[in-house]
Amino acid sequence: PPYFAPYVQGFKTIKPNDWEAIKTSFDDTTAALMIECVQGEGGVNLIDPKWAQAAAQAARKAGAIVMADEVQTGFGRTGSLLASDELGFEPEVVSFAKGVAGGLPMGGILFRGKANGVFKAGDHQSTFAGNPLACAAGLVVLNELQKPEFLEGVKEKGEYIRSQIKNWKNKNVGEVRGKGLMIGADIVEGLSAVEVEKKLLENGLLTSTAGKNTLRLVPPLNISQSEIDEGLEILRKTLETF
């Protein structure tokens, strides 16, 4: 998104699921490929697993490592521990944050393969890294995510929310997509997703926007069925006012 500018130097961006770009984007000057497993700020755009695997293969053939940006998608958000597991491209580096400590500030990087050993014990990475409170919360989150029924519940809740919104056939909503509890609903041209977001907040439902005109729904992973239905009712009634 433009509001992230200026972008980090040294990166060349390619559109997700662009097969032609794979053929021309990698050479012996390429250090790494980073894949955002579901484009969050870009509009909750899904990545084709076959494309991700092909892009990773092309990058490795050029001598590069493959990295996964799991800051938004990691630790259960999409219904898997890591969304890259679902895409099947097996990254050497994974960055994560947000949900790992259940809302407390925490983040980290995982390394393996060619990237293993880049950081060693004692290397400075973060002033407040490893603080006891966030780590204790992280352990609780990880224990919950180890339960298969929890992650399966995330998938079921997400499918329920998406199907309900689609079934309304509201004139103000275009495509509805997502994975797990990372959901995007495109707002049709002529109506601003930001205006919908503001009205929803007035009515008691916290959402956000992404991409060009997408309403983004990312509820807590432990949201109850009654809370889902309450939120959906607010969303339905609000959309009908436009």
Language-model segments: residues:
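Conserved N-terminal phosphate-binding loop of PLP-dependent enzymes in the Aspartate aminotransferase
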Residues: P1-F242
